[in-house]
A protein has these predicted regions:
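Intrinsically disordered, serine/threonine- and proline-rich low-complexity regions
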Residues: 1-10, 23-24
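Alpha-helical solenoid repeats of the armadillo/HEAT superfamily
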Residues: 1-3, 14-15, 29-52, 77-96, ...
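Recurring C-terminal helix/loop segment of individual leucine-rich repeat
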Residues: 10, 59, 102, 147, ...
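Buried hydrophobic core positions in alpha-solenoid tandem helical repeats
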Residues: 20-25, 69-73, 112-117, 157-159, ...
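Helix-turn-helix repeat elements of alpha-solenoid scaffolds
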Residues: 64-65
Length: 358
């Protein structure tokens, strides 16, 4: 019990286990014998397991110069599905810190992973697809990698899997796109105008059996708006029926998702209120905002963004009528004495706006 499993992993690496495993892989990779195939699987699985420890992973990476890292790279273009899988999982594990990710992208790993994905678009090998997408998602986290990966065509490569009916693949696909467009306005606009993608997102927002896919679809819808700030993107999302999902997302139990939804909705209200008006009304946004502002448990940023949104919604006649009918002034004036200064300030501004409008 005194040993953490990370310590054990590091000791196994230092004791030379990796070299033994690589030798087994070398010996069994071209064999069709059942026991060899099973040995290959065990050895490559163990290899991936050792990389789950932070120190053992960093030791084997050796700044990207490590012979082990190089050997694992050579698994990705291999003809063995088992080695392709282990190679992609190993890269996803090496890609757990920014330094490693930046080094790998600068040294051409992205093309190798895209080639691997290309080999599996049609055959539906879910485990390999999932592993390669996991690696790409992790590699896309550092800011400097995003533009490089976008210009290498990663978004297009990932979109080939939009047709997939497998939730694990859908989940990683969504996560990869969301990482790629973070603060990348042009890419967010391009993807946000892609009707096929947006329609698929709206469909997945209803995937009640797969909370992960549902959550990621909502977050990507919101991200497309937040990072593009584009009227065209908003129109595409309105036409595809995405507004109601963003309104529902504002009631999520996760503050980060609530906030992403409110910021996206505020952009919609600022840029395309007339287009979205009907959908916002039908989704009962005004009632939801009233609830968020009245609820003592709402986080300060939720209260702040809800008030910003109310100020924007007043620009629409039907929505303004709803705001007036719901006694917002009372709720907002209470927030003027909120302990959070930003919330209190926004409450004063909102109160003035509401008073003028009434």
């Amino acid at each position: 019990p005194c040993y953490s499993s990370d310590v054990i992993k590091l000791q196994l690496v230092e004791a030379g286990l990796v070299e033994c495993l690589l030798e087994i892989v070398q010996k069994t990779v071209d064999s069709d014998k059942e026991e060899d195939i099973s040995e290959l699987k065990t050895a490559s699985d163990l290899m991936v397991l050792l990389l789950l420890g932070d120190e053992s992973m960093q030791k084997l990476f050796e700044g990207g110069k490590g012979s082990v890292f190089q050997r694992v790279l050579s698994w990705i273009p291999s003809n063995s599905h088992q080695l392709q899988l282990a190679g992609a999982l190993a890269i996803a594990n090496f890609a757990r810190n920014d330094g490693n990710c930046i080094h790998m992208v600068d040294n051409g790993i992205v093309q190798k992973l895209m080639d691997l994905l290309d080999r599996h678009v049609e055959d539906g090998n879910v485990t390999v697809q999932h592993a390669a997408l996991s690696a790409l998602r992790n590699l896309a986290i550092p800011v400097v990698n995003k533009a490089k990966m976008l210009s290498a065509g990663v978004a297009e490569a990932v979109l080939k899997f939009l047709r997939s009916e497998m939730p694990p693949v859908q989940f990683k696909l969504l996560g990869t796109l969301r990482m790629l467009i973070d603060a990348q306005a042009e890419a967010a606009e391009q993807l946000g105008k892609n009707v096929k993608l947006v329609e698929r997102l709206v469909e997945w927002c209803e995937a009640k059996d797969h909370a992960g896919v549902m959550g990621e679809s909502n977050r990507l819808l919101s991200a497309l708006i937040r990072h593009s700030k584009s009227k065209d993107v908003i129109r595409t999302i309105v036409q595809s029926g995405g507004i109601k999902h963003l309104v529902t997302m504002a009631t999520s139990e996760h503050v980060i998702m609530q906030n992403e939804a409110l910021v996206a909705l505020a952009l919609i209200a600022a840029l395309e209120l007339v287009t979205a008006e009907k959908d916002l009304e039908n989704a009962q946004l005004v009632q939801i905002l009233h609830r968020l502002l009245s609820d003592d448990r709402s986080a300060p940023e939720i209260k702040y963004n809800s008030m910003v949104l109310i100020c924007a919604l007043i620009g629409s006649e039907p929505l303004q009528k709803e705001v007036q009918s719901m006694a917002f002034l009372e709720v907002v004036s209470k927030l003027r004495s909120h302990e959070n200064k930003t919330v209190a300030q926004q409450a004063s501004l909102t109160e003035q706006r509401l008073a003028v409008e009434s």
